[in-house]
């Protein structure tokens, strides 16, 4: 589960940067 946390943060960061 801990491995999914940084992946989720990375995805959110990528989306925020795209916006």
Curated annotation (Swiss-Prot):
Sorted alphabetically, the keyword list is:
Amidation, Amphibian defense peptide, Antimicrobial, Secreted
Localization per Swiss-Prot or TrEMBL: Secreted
Tissue/organ expression: Expressed by the skin glands.
Question: What's the chief localization of this chain?
Answer: secreted
Cellular component terms, GO, for this chain's entry?
extracellular region
Leucine amide modifications at: 19
State any GO BP term from the record: defense response
Function noted in UniProt: Has antimicrobial activity.
Which family does this protein fall into? Answer: Belongs to the frog skin active peptide (FSAP) family. Phylloseptin subfamily.
What name does the UniProt record give this protein? Answer: Phylloseptin-J5
Organism of provenance: Phasmahyla jandaia
């Amino acid at each position: 589960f801990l491995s999914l946390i940084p992946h989720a943060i990375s995805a959110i960061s990528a989306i925020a940067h795209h916006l």
